[in-house]
């Protein structure tokens, strides 16, 4: 039925489900615009879609169309949607967790049990 359309469309139009928030294309655009003007060209040309929510057919083409409509007309927009993107978030987290520089941010169960959620802010920010 039309759920196949409505479900992924919610990513671009959250108002479909009563949410007053920006779609993924607007959030991407707003994030790029908050960055230094000297790197925006690179950011527009290197958008990588990741996670299971991006597995909808045609989502990369739709993202390309929507970002192109928002960006300056001379800007090259490139949306990368690797076939393994369903697991790329987990893979990225796995790589990050294995870096020796990240170990100082590890939180043990004992630390969390003793300090609660505030330990995350103390160790990670």
Swiss-Prot record:
Keyword Transcription: no
Statement: the UniProt record of this protein carries the keyword Plastid: no
Subcellular location: Cytoplasm, Cytoskeleton
Keywords, comma-separated and alphabetical: ATP-binding, Cytoplasm, Cytoskeleton, Muscle protein, Nucleotide-binding
Record GO terms (molecular function): ATP binding
UniProt cross-references to SUPFAM superfamilies, sorted A to Z: Actin-like ATPase domain
InterPro entries xref list: Actin, Actin_CS, ATPase_NBD
GO cellular component: cytoplasm; cytoskeleton
Pfam families per UniProt: Actin
Main subcellular location: cytoplasm
Superkingdom, taxonomy of origin: Eukaryota
Listed PROSITE patterns: ACTINS_2 (PS00432)
Coiled coil regions, renumbered to chain: none
Family: Belongs to the actin family.
Free-text function comment from the UniProt entry: Actins are highly conserved proteins that are involved in various types of cell motility and are ubiquitously expressed in all eukaryotic cells.
PANTHER family according to UniProt: ACTIN
Quaternary context: Polymerization of globular actin (G-actin) leads to a structural filament (F-actin) in the form of a two-stranded helix. Each actin can bind to 4 others.
Official protein name in the record: Actin, alpha skeletal muscle
Native source species: Pleurodeles waltl
Lineage: Eukaryota, Metazoa, Chordata, Craniata, Vertebrata
